[in-house]
Structures are given as C-alpha cells and as structure tokens.
C-alpha cells in the first residue's frame, strides 16, 4: 500500500490528480518555505475530450515536472472517514486493531477495505476517551487509481482523501492561525472542515440540492447550512476546549459561493468570505484555476507539501 501521509518536502513541485469516470482534475503547484505557493495548473479535463491517461502523459515530457511528487485522490463514494476509540496497542498495530471496530460502521465489507489512521487533536480535559480518525477505502478504488497513475509518472507517492486536501487549502488561509471554517460546495453536498494552525479538527458532509438542476440555479438552504455550521462550531469549542472560530470561507468555483456568502452573513452574523486563489497563490500567467469541486480537491492534493501530518 502507498503511504497516505508522508513527511513534507519543501522547494518542490507536486501534482494533484483526482480521476473520475466523466472527468479528471489536475493541479500543479510548487511550494517553497517562506513563499506563497506557485500555481502552475488547475483544470478539469472532461473524459469526452481527453482520457485520464492522456491528461497525465505530458508530465514525464516536461523536465521540471518529471520528478514531481504525485498525489492521487479518492472520490467521495470510494471511502469513509470515521472516528473510533483508539485501541491501546503499539502504533505499528493500530491499523489492524481498528479494523474489527469498522465492521458495524462502514457500509461495505471490512475485508475489502484499505485502512489508515491519523490522530485527532487532544480533546478537552473532561473527555477521557482518546479518539482517532480512521479512513476505510474500497480496495478496488485504490487499485484503480494506482493502475491509472503509477505507470505514467515517476513519483506517485501519496493517496489522499478530499477532507485532507481541503485541510491543506484551509491551512493557507490567514484565519487558520486562530481557527477557520472552510465550506467547499460540490454537486449535491457541502464539505465542511474546521482547522486551526494546519490541524484538522472536524470534517462534516452537508447534503445540498444538486448544482446540476435546470439552469444551475438550485437554491441552497442557507438556514440549514447555518444550523449545521453552528452545531459543528459548538462541538469544536466544547469538545476541544478551543476559542470560537469567527470566520467562514466558501469555495465553489461558481456563483453559489457568493450567494451562500451573503445568506450566511445574515444567518450567522459571522465574517464570511469567498475563497480567492489569487490571494493565497502566485498564479502563473495565463492560468485560470477551475475551482469546481474536482479542481479544488486536486489543488489541495498538490499542496500536500504545505502541511504536516496532523
């Protein structure tokens, strides 16, 4: 199995790839300590125009990208991210020990799952049970991405999930120093992550009307989103004994972000901003980042070197 979370590397290019049946998202970023990341490419390539393997082919023909690290990202339907009580075992035995706990939690056979774990930040003093995040991925989905990417690049070294990709993006936000809520809008859902100083504290999926409704103008239940946000923020404060988060950032790559921003300001009274890549990246000339869900996630995957393992 590939290592899902490896040590960070500075002063290097990284490629984020999110393949799907209908499209492949590809992002290329260079990170250097003390500098804003350089965004060289962030696009979604429809399968009807170019196959996924052809999207990757130019990487080996370009000298500066040929040795770039490559992160592949699982689609949301191909894994589950859950919290479980941490078994009292040696760290090397942790994956095997949590597998049996997943039998009644995940919705596919645990025997078919590829398992990885990472720490949840320390809970408040009155919470005695240590919890951990567990990623259970469908083995066939992991194999499919490996077969697609590994033969076509030199350094395919990370398999990632969207929540961790969003964590990487959230860590770039100025408000992350005190804590920030990033809301990424997909087709039919919003993914919320709460981070502080680059650490993922909470991830929650919120169901929404499909963005593919006629004319793409499906309304979002802002009151419902605000309620889920408030529940998550309250949990963050009480469970982790943290100061309140005061800023929400929305990313969607379309007009929904601005509409939801205006509505959430009214619903919550909090500071709500739209994710703007030009404020966080040095964007190469001629690059117009596509920040719809697949592109946004690929961009976060390409920032893998920006964050340390939480």
Regions found by a protein language model. Name each.
Residues 1-310:
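Hydrophobic/aromatic-enriched cytosolic interaction surfaces used to assemble or bind macromolecules
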